[in-house]
């Protein structure tokens, strides 16, 4: 409530000025005040921040730059495949190398390199990748719809756009290319666009980036021959490497904190608000789990956020341990949300058994409930063997626990499955999937989980 005139407000015989009325309306809310204790610049710990220097990736950067040297010499580019799990520096390395190449080509008269970068996370086919690449090259008013064209026409349009560039080279960066699954046609046609005569005047190179270690192995032989001229593996960071990354960022993120780089490349930290165990503990937690710098930074940021909320003067080991629990919950939610529908239906079957207090359960009981759920939403019903494989995958991802039961010669041995994470987290994520919404709508009391 905001007053703009000079009238008074009388309540129970008491005359209140406008200022008092305004204070009464917002009573209980704290004033917004700049953080002068914990964070100096919290953005450096959050997703989207771009550091000036990428540490602990010297070898990978050198290999990447070496692979692109033919371009600056006017030769055809190599096709590259970068792989490693999330948060190990693949995308950031690629952008740094591409920007350096773009900067250095400005000094050359006979080399003109065009760059196109596309994140394929939300794309699930070569057709969609090709259509989106066409729109990357076109002006907004000339862009096409992502569906409705014959496959051959889409590739013809893409090759025409490459011909129009009037450049000596075009490097196409396809990030998270594993999203297209087995439909890898684009990864054959684009790297071979010159050899097959589809593009004549511009040398085309493809840089594929994947978070999935198995994606490269599952590529067809012809794609491997075309795409993988050179492969660069980005391994997980170890605890020491993560510690250096955290120290570098902490010096910018927190008040009273400085870092200096020693001759051996390691960082030394001095801080008034970070207890000595904070950085090593964040690094150790992330290294043990995934080796992801993104996870380590998220953990340090969460610990700082908790300290700020508590109006603490420093960040402690206790903040880190509680932050680790919170980040772990968030990570499971994100990973659950990315699962394909068939995996979610499998988990739904376990939710039904959980509601019946029937976990752990054998595979055949889980499969029975999976079939009911799949039919309910008109999804394809997979075989028992396929669901067995999905149960194994869900176990490897940490969502399920499996135990072997041996009932002797008569009963035989079999496996039983149950949740390794809280069932309510699984339920919340599945309920938020529009495809599965009908399973939670309360239409059929035997199927729905409204009273879960």
Each language-model region and where it sits:
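Mid-core helix/loop region of P-loop NTP-binding domains shared across ATPases and GTPases
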Residues: 29-35, 122-131, 136-189, 193-229, ...
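Terminal-proximal interaction/regulatory segments of ATP-powered molecular machines
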Residues: 360-452
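Short alpha-helical segments that sit at the start of domains
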Residues: 326-349, 353-360
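Walker A/P-loop nucleotide-binding motif
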Residues: 76-99
